[in-house]
Amino acid sequence: ESVLGGTDELLTGGLVDFAVTSSVPPGYLGDLLMTIPIVAAAAPHHPLHQLGRPLTQRDLRRHRHLVIRDTAQRRKRETGNWLGANQRWTFSHKASQIAAACMGHGFAWFPIDTIRTELDSGRLVRLPLREGAERRAELYLVHADRDCTGPAATRLAKIIRASVAKACAGRGEAGAAE
């Protein structure tokens, strides 16, 4: 598993046959797999939920932002650090980030499917943002060099495309063509 620049490094370094990534590195072509809604969420007892009004960017900046560490070796950045929060905790794993949010240690931007169980159980609640309550990220399947990809990797890429298309169709969303 890699995040942000780490995925680009794996592709450009020839260490993987293909990758699923939210950005296509310069010089590569990618096939759109799906679009993912991303939402801000925190535990129901978090102070942001206690304000009782739509939240502003200023409100978010005053609270701890939980972000995921970039796996890149050369250039690092944290995911979800768009707001420049005064406080932030950086995690290496999504599960740790989700657990910290559920415990009320801060808020984070999550792909909605990643926290579906926590939202359904009430352990996390979407933040009532005045604007920008939902973002979207696109996921692409990018081959390092399609002509050099072996039969197993080619088959796996085809299975991923088909699985994503089926899952998206089951939810009434547009997804990858098989």
Give residue ranges: language-model regions:
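Conserved alpha-helical elements of sugar-nucleotide-dependent glycosyltransferases
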Residues: 3, 152
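A bilobed periplasmic-binding-protein/Venus flytrap-type ligand-binding module shared by bacterial periplasmic
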Residues: 41-45, 138-151
